[in-house]
């Protein structure tokens, strides 16, 4: 689980 500024939480 990583945080991406424009996409939010992605798995």
UniProtKB/Swiss-Prot annotation:
Record flagged with keyword Secreted: yes
Subcellular location(s) per record: Secreted
A biological-process GO annotation: neuropeptide signaling pathway
UniProt KW Nuclease keyword: no
Entry keywords, A to Z: Amidation, Neuropeptide, Pyrrolidone carboxylic acid, Secreted
Modified residues (Asparagine amide): 11
Modified sites of kind Pyrrolidone carboxylic acid: 1
Cellular component GO terms, alphabetical: extracellular region
Purpose: Cardioactive peptide. Corazonin is probably involved in the physiological regulation of the heart beat.
Family, similarity comment: Belongs to the corazonin family.
Name under which the protein is recorded: Corazonin
Protein species of origin: Namaquaphasma ookiepense (Gladiator bug)
Lineage: Eukaryota, Metazoa, Ecdysozoa, Arthropoda, Hexapoda
